[in-house]
A protein has these predicted regions:
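A short, structure-level motif marking secondary-structure boundaries and short turns
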Residues: 23-26, 61, 93-95, 117-118
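Generic enzyme active-site microenvironment
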Residues: 9-11, 53, 126
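A short alpha-helix capping/helix-coil boundary motif
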Residues: 16-20, 53-56, 88-90, 110-113, ...
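Asp-based, Mg2+/Mn2+-dependent phosphohydrolase catalytic module
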Residues: 2-4, 67-85, 94-171
Length: 171
């Protein structure tokens, strides 16, 4: 069976919310990046599922809980008008436990591909780390690297989600 279902997989910290140099688990420190709600609305209007995939190793390190992560995700959903289709997080850290979900592994993407019956050739991943791009590549998803955090010549590389949405939408 063929499908036309398409998605944009979105890393969280550094793409959807501001990277503050440490773990972000408190809603009052969870600052949504400029242009994110509008960019997500444009992608949704073009028929994309919007799926957040984020490593949250602070849970494994006992710095915060899954409920803290979910509170930040609720703030994000509210700011974006509830248009996010799924929010997955990997709560493992290599120093504590192994996980096939934690990026650069592709477990979170694989779960979403199955759940939404996605055609990976029509999907994208937008992230600020090479591990995001590696997770996408493992399932055949094209990647867009955001920001200057990672050294290297990965392309395409853009400043923010607005510019990534322009590429995805062919603008």
């Amino acid at each position: 069976m063929t499908t036309n279902n398409k998605a944009v997989f979105l890393d969280r910290d550094g793409v959807l919310n501001e990277e503050i140099g440490t773990y972000v688990w408190e809603p009052d420190k969870f600052i949504i990046c400029a242009g994110v709600p509008e960019s997500l609305a444009r992608l949704k209007a073009a028929g994309y599922y919007l799926i957040v995939i984020t490593n949250q190793a602070g849970i494994a390190k006992k710095l915060y809980t899954a409920a803290d992560v979910q509170a930040c995700h609720a703030k994000l959903q509210s700011a974006c008008g509830g248009i996010l289709d799924a929010l997955y997080f990997a709560d493992a850290h290599p120093s504590v436990s192994e996980s096939i979900l934690r990026k650069p592994a592709s477990g979170m993407l694989e779960k979403a591909v199955a759940r939404f019956n996605l055609d990976v050739s029509q999907c994208w991943i937008v992230g600020d780390r090479l591990r995001d791009m590696q997770a996408g590549a493992a399932v055949g998803v094209r990647g867009i690297l955001v920001g200057e955090t990672e050294v290297g010549d990965f392309a395409p590389r853009v400043a923010d989600l607005r510019a990534a949405a322009d590429i995805i939408l062919g603008m």
